[in-house]
A protein has these predicted regions:
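C-terminal transmembrane-helix exit sites in multi-pass transporters
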Residues: 49, 54, 106-131, 256-275
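Hydrophobic transmembrane alpha-helices of multi-pass small-molecule transport proteins
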Residues: 50, 54, 122-144, 197, ...
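Juxtamembrane C-cap of transmembrane helices in multi-pass membrane transport proteins
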Residues: 16-33, 45, 84-94, 102, ...
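C-terminal-most transmembrane helix of multi-pass membrane proteins
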Residues: 43, 142-143, 215, 252-314
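Helix-helix packing/entry segments at the starts of transmembrane helices
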Residues: 41, 80, 99-105, 173-194, ...
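Hydrophobic alpha-helical transmembrane segments of multi-pass integral membrane proteins
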Residues: 5-13, 36-56, 74, 125-135, ...
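Specific transmembrane alpha-helical segments of multi-pass solute transporters/efflux pumps
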Residues: 51-97, 139, 223-241
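Glycine-/small-residue-enriched transmembrane alpha-helix faces in small-molecule transporters
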Residues: 1-41, 148-175, 195, 300-314
Length: 314
């Protein structure tokens, strides 16, 4: 297997690791943790693991200026804390598969933000891709039945808000990445996101689960698997020479993984309409192959890891 082929495998693994977000989150919430506490757990343990890994492999990326701290605080609050909070709340209310589908509407909001903030053109090809994504999302959420009465409106709103927070990452951080490594911003945004979550998550209450080894293990895995380890695998794939645009498409396996986990392990509803909707969303990602679609992954899918390519050989 060639180096680039290995890169594709690593990126696909990263996507599947991200897909476990809902699985770990659902287990923890099912054992009594609030969604705020689950969000805090992911950010806190993710920061610890990534911080340790970075200090061993590339300690220079932990150096940060006052300006970098300001960027990290803003991104940590808006794009990390708010994203995780909304996403886990959506998972708790509407389930893993629907929450994942709603999250993947983020390219729609990215296109709007890019147009408003940076005057980027929405070409016909990009518009076609976004329309496919929108139709696919509706099909996947409703199962092909245009009946929204059985759906929880608040849960859907939270899913959409998570997509908005997700799309705000490249919008807010575009200038920051001209001066700082995305890994630097990632580590510290996890830290400040966790700090911001302290008042609402009341992490000291999590100590009540100190005797529950299953919960403690799952909390640690939440910080390792869909957080630190997924980013490390993605960075490894990029370092093998995989094109950034192609990497964004390969990582879309996350959506498929999330739906499969939701429908099989967690027993969520499944229909041909939902399958068709997910397929449309994946097709929209392929259509966007030569567009700027993968900019949405600056942090969560790390498609801007150019600094790692230059400074780190994983």
């Amino acid at each position: 297997m060639g180096e680039k082929s290995k890169g594709y495998v690593f990126i696909a693994i990263a996507g599947l690791l991200w897909a476990t977000l809902g699985l770990f989150g659902k287990f923890l919430m099912g054992n009594g943790l609030a969604s705020e506490q689950v969000a805090f757990t992911r950010l806190f343990f993710g920061f610890i693991v990534l911080g340790i890994y970075s200090s061993i492999r590339t300690p220079q990326i932990l150096k940060i200026s006052k300006k970098g701290i300001i960027y990290s605080v803003i991104i940590g609050i808006i794009c990390q804390a708010m994203f995780n909070l909304c996403y886990f709340k959506a998972i708790d209310i509407v389930g893993v598969s629907i929450a994942a589908v709603l999250l993947y509407t983020s390219p729609l909001f990215l296109a709007i933000f890019s147009k408003v903030c940076y005057k980027e053109n929405i070409t016909r090809s990009k518009l076609f891709s976004l329309i496919l994504c929108f139709i696919g999302a509706i099909m996947a959420v409703t199962g092909g039945r245009l009946d929204f009465q059985g759906l929880n409106a608040f849960g859907l709103l939270l899913g959409i808000l998570s997509a908005i927070a997700y799309a705000l990452m490249p919008t807010i951080s575009k200038n920051a990445l001209k001066e700082f490594s995305s890994s630097t911003i990632l580590v510290y945004s996890f830290l400040f996101g966790a700090i911001f979550m302290i008042p609402s998550s009341k992490p000291w209450e999590i100590l009540n689960y100190a005797n529950n080894l299953d919960v403690l293990f799952c909390m640690l895995m939440l910080g390792i698997v869909p957080a630190a380890l997924a980013y490390i695998f993605y960075a490894t794939g990029i370092s093998k020479g995989v094109e950034l645009s192609v990497a964004g498409i390969v990582a879309s396996v996350e959506l498929v993984g999330s739906v499969i986990i939701g429908c099989t392990i967690l027993g969520e509803s499944f229909s041909l309409g939902k399958l068709f909707g997910v397929m449309l969303m994946l097709i929209s990602a392929v259509v966007a192959l030569n567009l700027s679609y993968d900019e949405i992954r600056i942090f969560y899918k790390s498609s801007k890891l150019k600094q790692i390519e230059k400074t780190e050989s994983i």
